[in-house]
Amino acid sequence: HFDGSDINFKTLAGKNFKSSFREHFRFSKTYDLPGTMDVEFEIFDAYFKKIIPDLKLRLYGSEDRPQSRPVVRDNLKVDAEDNSSRNVTHPLIYLSLKRLMPIAERSKYSLNSEEVEYFTRISREFTITNNRLLGKISGTTVSKTTGTIESAVVHGNNYDHESVSVGEDNTGQILMALFSFQKLKEEYVDYHGGILLIDEIDAGLFPA
């Protein structure tokens, strides 16, 4: 948070609403050296309701790690003593291609009893949205799963979470991310929207 206070809200997968550079990029010790990246960009900060016109992203050296460290500079300051070298304050969920790992290849996979009350409340809306996305009407029950990947899957009365397809599981992960933002909006008074990044969103969107 920009004022240094902790924001302890979690997604329905039990993670923080943020994504680190290492989830998106792998920097080379040989070629990605300090000073070799100099990016300037502009973004609208919904929290401050202002455009940040001159944000800079550069690579810097670090004594405690072999790779260069990406740092954002020239962010907005609340007062003169604030540090402008900070990331933009905005809730974010990133779903990588790891979400498409087949259930049979996951070392751990089981039902998850966390957030049962919330999932019970949204189960009808979750199921309807899932069926609409996959073009099916057989989905009737939501099961939250845990293990190698956190997910929530919709299945019918004649099979359970053990037998769902990659498409059903992938759709469940996407919906769980969307409903995570809905839950955050209900609980966080300073909510101003969020960002959902999905790597190759069309991959795996098939019902069986």
Report the location of each language-model feature.
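Walker B catalytic acidic pair
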Residues: 199-201
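ABC ATPase nucleotide-binding domain "signature" loop
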Residues: 203-205
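Contiguous mid-protein beta-loop-alpha structural module that forms a pocket-lining wall or clamp
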Residues: 208
